């Protein structure tokens, strides 16, 4: 792959992209706080609710999603369980495995937060599309 000399517009786009992401992250953290969650608890609930498959995730699954060490994920799940947001349940097929699922309260909070996040992401999609597809930069198309 040949290296292309990047122009000023490329760096301006990159900066705008990073600022846009950071603003979304800050907004998301504020939304979580207003819902009574820490931003890390919100990420945990997203990981549980967004887990693919027919069974809830394990703590190991959650550690992978959140890029945490397993013992850190255990502590996070402990705190969320103490807050009434999640519950642990034994796996139906392997008694050594514990799964984590949302409580009714955790699910209610996730429904509210996800609705506002999806609305915000639709707004950001147009901004990001413009950044990626606008002319003036020198970076090659993919």
State each model region's role.
Residues 54, 132-142:
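Short, charged, intrinsically disordered terminal tails
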Residues 26-69:
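N-terminal helix-turn-helix DNA-binding core of bacterial DNA-binding proteins
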Residues 16, 43-47, 108:
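Pre-recognition alpha-helix immediately N-terminal to the DNA-recognition helix
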Residues 78-136:
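Charged, amphipathic alpha-helical coiled-coil/dimerization segments
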Residues 1-35, 83-85, 138-142:
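N-terminal leader segment of winged-helix/HTH proteins
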Residues 59, 77-78:
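Short, hydrophobic-biased segments on the C-terminal half of alpha helices
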Residues 18-21, 66, 110, 114:
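Amphipathic, non-transmembrane alpha-helical scaffold segments
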């Amino acid at each position: 792959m040949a290296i292309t000399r990047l122009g000023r517009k490329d760096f301006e786009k990159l900066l705008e992209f990073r600022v846009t992401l950071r603003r979304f992250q800050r907004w998301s953290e504020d939304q979580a706080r207003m819902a009574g969650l820490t931003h890390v608890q919100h990420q945990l609930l997203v990981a549980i609710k967004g887990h693919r498959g027919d069974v809830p995730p394990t703590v190991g699954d959650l550690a992978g999603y959140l890029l945490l060490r397993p013992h850190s994920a255990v502590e996070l799940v402990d705190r969320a369980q103490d807050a009434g947001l999640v519950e642990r349940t034994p796996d139906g097929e392997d008694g050594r495995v514990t799964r984590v699922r949302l409580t009714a309260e955790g699910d209610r909070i996730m429904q509210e937060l996800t609705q506002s996040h999806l609305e915000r992401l639709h707004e950001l999609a147009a901004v990001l599309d413009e950044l990626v597809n606008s002319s003036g930069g020198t970076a090659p198309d993919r």
